[in-house]
UniProtKB/Swiss-Prot annotation:
Originating gene: luxS
Organism: Streptococcus sanguinis (strain SK36)
Subunit structure: Homodimer.
Top-rank EC class of the record's enzyme: lyase
Entry annotated with the keyword Lyase: yes
Family: Belongs to the LuxS family.
Keywords: Autoinducer synthesis, Iron, Lyase, Metal-binding, Quorum sensing
Full protein name: S-ribosylhomocysteine lyase
Amino acid sequence: MSKEVVVESFELDHTIVKAPYVRLIGEETGPKGDIISNFDIRLVQPNEDSIPTAGLHTIEHLLAMLIRKRIDGMIDCSPFGCRTGFHMIMWGQHSSSQIAQVIKSCLEEIAESTSWEDVPGTTIESCGNYKDHSLFSAKEWAKLILSQGISDDAFERHVI
């Protein structure tokens, strides 16, 4: 007896999305009624660009801290293997527009005022690949993404 499994991200037509954007992938309700929201935080255009691992790794560490400073309920924000953005899992219901504002604010802080001392988890004790970071790359990518504007719609540009 085999179970039919559909992985939403493999069903998404990556040729028609318009990055940078935030997209609500879906919401799930747990057995006790708790809602979890899953977001596609796409920072660069799929199959046209990708963020180098060191810069993406640093953005990941910074977002882990900066998002939590701006909004309650973040469970996780993990990079896509294709290095074009992140999955973000949140408790509760949130709009794409609300999350796009949070991501924009985080990227502004990364681009404008973040120093190496601000990057959490960069020691051998706190990171599984602590040598693979680049604040320079993270800042440059944040500036580029911000210059393009972040949309709250994956298919039609609606820059927030």
